[in-house]
């Protein structure tokens, strides 16, 4: 809505490419930005749960990929649509006063971020202070739940407001994905499915395997839920890596990150769907630039995985 308000100062027909550049830039930036942190996208958490990675651990793997992909994606958008970047917009600024609630919200946000990022160091110290025999399990989850409780207790938001503004369907989808991954792993189903795939790719070069897996997940996630795809495939490809005597990190990260790389179809990611729903971006325009971005993501993710994770 904010960008649409700003873009309304332009001529829809004359400056159409600028409209498309800005709107797709926002959608794609949201997708790429989500790769950087554990909470950025459900596939991240699914892959992290199978690899037993914490918030800080994921930052070390996801952030470099995000930083590499972001300028390349903006570059593709510029090359394809050639927007007018020299335009000037009239803007009105409203002074926002720092109320007690806003200050408390900022404090909670900073505290949660610090606890997530430095949880590996803080968790043992906190556990020792509390007299616990071992570090707190699922520390990142406990931090998030504690923050939600503090928000309600301090009156920043009521429980009814939390209920009304929480996307419960997304949470159930996310939880279902984690459950599916766990069931596939512990039931042995992922190993059975992996054995059939190993027979086909065994003996191939690791980089070729990485490219095939990256291409497979990127194409698949264009047409299916990235959460469901990651939930199904992460445990399978971890089993494949183990059968090939490879580190499981490589294939799992390719699936986890690649599941977010849907840039051609409106149904690929929620940001794509939101931008497409504005009516200013055609599906053909998304495909026009998205095919180049998809190919770029396949190569970059596969290359990083091969060089550092396999």
Segments and roles (model prediction):
Residues 1-35, 44-51, 226-257:
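Hydrophobic transmembrane alpha-helices that form the pore/transport pathway of multi-pass ion
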Residues 1-13, 163-244:
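Membrane-embedded alpha-helical segments and adjacent helix-loop junctions characteristic
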Residues 4, 8-11, 80-82, 151-164, ...:
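C-terminal ends of transmembrane helices
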Residues 27-39, 215-226, 256-267:
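Transmembrane alpha-helix interface/packing and boundary motifs in multi-pass membrane proteins
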Residues 57-195, 292-298, 302-310:
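Hydrophobic transmembrane alpha-helices of multi-pass small-molecule transporters
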Residues 64-70, 136-148, 196-209, 250-265:
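Structural signature of hydrophobic alpha-helical transmembrane segments
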Residues 162, 277-296:
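Interfacial loop-to-transmembrane junctions
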